[in-house]
Amino acid sequence: MKIMSVNSGSSSLKFQLLEMPQQEVIVSGLVERIGSNQAVFTMKTKDKKDKQVLEVLNHQTAVELLLDALIQKKVINTLEEIEGVGHRVVQGGEIFSDSAVLTEKTLAQIESLCDLAPLHNPANIISIKAFQKVLPQVFQVAVFDTTFHQSMPAVNFLYATPYYWYQKYQIRKYGAHGTSYKYITEQMQQILGKKNAKIIICHAGNGVSLCAVDSGKSVDTSMGFTPLEGVPMGTRSGNIDPAVVKFIAEKENKTVACVIDDLNKKSGYLGVSGISNDTRDILASIKEGNQQAILSHDIQVKRIVDYIASYYVLLKGVDALVFTAGIGENSSFFRSEIIKRLSVLGIKLDEEKNKVQGKQELITTFDSAIKAFVVPTNEELAIAQDVLRLQQNQTNQDKDDQQECFCCCG
């Protein structure tokens, strides 16, 4: 069956059409700059890539555009071939501990969580409604970034703030990148042959977070109430003293919102280096001896190592350290700098194997006390897998209900 995975932002819509359960990517694409007359629509199949610039004023138009293109390019013959749609939703709060079939009730619940993710959930909802309008009979599912972390114990997700903040406003750690962590966890359980494996995962892209996993469940993660908490990233500061916000607001004559915006969009690699938020630019500048680039990278690596060491203690040992996402999968320098700083734990890097890019590989030596792996993530596939799982569950439930009705009435 054909399932579409969708990841929508406020001005973008990323999609992938997969044949399931074969896990075959049929087509992928992206609509950027939604809301303008200079929107960019890119669609890629196995052997061809098309790109056009056109007017796309809203998400509804973007959805209609991509679905029309699938038919025009003969990727599918009719829309009826699409049997499921999975939507990435950033914030599921404490309401959702699993992906959810999209109904009027679940959509209303997602809308109720917009305060917790004002930049993301509204855009996710707009996209969901656009797909529901064009594909009203198609099975659709919300897959949340936060659900994987709902297994964290209170001691790990609560802040030491007035408790009523949590009771009244749900102030707590929610985490992010949960879909990626769930996928990597399942991959590692297969690789290690252990369901009860203790794993530390470093998801490093422009956004960076870490997760401690025990027996398939998240027990702690670095991102918090928002993705701003944790380690420095491309443009995010990571952890800072909260008093800095008030101090800078007063000194720079800015609102608190403006300072938070600076911490989200003008900090991290970009803020410290003054060069770029892109790791490739930072690494190129490091090779040239740029001290600010070196410093920006060292700060990030130091904070990542802090989390790994903390999670090692939390888990009381670890079976594997995993690097994934854009930087984690492709930067041998990034991985090397982290592992070197963890030598006290007995982890030993295999320099030759560490040259791998974008492929699964064990990158530590045979006598390393901890195994370290590169494992590519695949969030689009993970979303499609959840759609397939929930659809099969619903089909089985419908059969059980019919059987029960037959027995009662017969």
Swiss-Prot record:
Q: Where in the cell is it found?
A: Cytoplasm
Task: Give, as one word, the top-level EC class.
Answer: transferase
Q: What GO CC annotations are associated with the protein?
A: cytoplasm
This enzyme's EC code(s): 2.7.2.1
List the catalytic activities from the record: acetate + ATP = acetyl phosphate + ADP
Pathway where it operates: Metabolic intermediate biosynthesis; acetyl-CoA biosynthesis; acetyl-CoA from acetate: step 1/2
| BP term (GO), one | acetyl-CoA biosynthetic process
Cross-referenced Gene3D superfamilies:
3.30.420.40
The UniProt record gives the binding positions of substrate as R88
> What cofactor does this chain's UniProt record say it requires?
Mg(2+); Mn(2+)
- Chain positions recorded as Mg(2+) binding sites: N7, E379
A Pfam family that the UniProt record links to this protein:
Acetate_kinase
Site location (Transition state stabilizer): H177, R236
Q: Which UniProt keywords apply?
A: ATP-binding, Cytoplasm, Kinase, Magnesium, Metal-binding, Nucleotide-binding, Transferase
Which NCBIfam families does the record associate with it? ackA
List the PANTHER family hit by this protein, alphabetically.
ACETATE KINASE, ACETATE KINASE-RELATED
Under the subunit heading, UniProt states: Homodimer.
Protein name per UniProt:
Acetate kinase
Origin species: Chlorante-Aster yellows phytoplasma
